[in-house]
């Protein structure tokens, strides 16, 4: 049972009776996170005026747990209620510029989705409290600012006077952060679709990605944004350490998302998929299993990872089927000026001239340091910035070898890196 949070000294202020919390602002259109007030969302450019911040958030990196001798009534109640978890994201920046590849998905002349992909995007999970808490406008939990132990809610004993030498608990909203390769699929007209449609399409695409690229279940996960009760976008991210290296293909390959949608329709127990796609008519799809699967089953769309959405998933939804047909027929159109990291093309040519294979499409990260060039089959990675000792140590424990590249490719590829690819 988790007993306390390990609070580093820098988060304590003054005499230790307060914590250095932050207010974060979340875009109500796409779910992007901003630390501080901004005029427009950095991801979708929507106005941020009037957005109510989530106050007093505190990043929690480490906790302490103790063995539980028995399950208490409070434990059972917390499990029964569940926690109100919200997922948000922010795109990485370099020299003040967003490091994002942008594209549109078009079916004919109609744009359906706006896509954004980034390596090492910051994915954050905010724990707002119990789902069935008494006051839904109050977020977070009480914590002892000195010891880090979780404390009782103030409203449980409102009339008890606290002695002056006792530190009062403070309320915080815990937030955990990680960096993952992420793809945002933003519906251009989300109000035109039922929540069941967006939920079904989300899990159909995730299953299609897993099958198309031969991934294990759970390697690619997705979240509806900005919230489960306000589905306007889908955030897909590579959940495994180092990433699977496939989400970037959905942006760079014009027909990759179409292949995924086609595979998803086949997984959903439909025949005559090619005929329906050619005609652009979902009514031509024929149910293969004669009623064995009604709205969804564990052979098609249902899984352990999407249990909260099981009531929404409906493979028989005409709207969901038509959207998947449109996705199978359309193609990706990269936005003007959208490209890979500055300098990557030059290094790709340098690697080729040195006789070593091209790096994977997605980067890897160690200790929050992005390694822009990665060769996963060789467990080798490189970057143009200075390597931290923490990154080297973590990479070494995982069996990776890291290299620092010169600032420009004109200086050539280091001999030590070239030797890693010699038989």
Identify the residue ranges that each predicted region occupies.
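Short, flexible, solvent-exposed loop/turn segments with mixed acidic/basic and small polar residues
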Residues: 16, 173-176, 371-373
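Extended, highly charged accessory segments
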Residues: 1-7, 37-338
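Nucleic-acid endo/exonuclease domains
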Residues: 206-210, 214, 259-260, 264-284, ...
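Intrinsic-disorder/low-complexity loop/linker signature
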Residues: 15-17, 31, 148, 291, ...
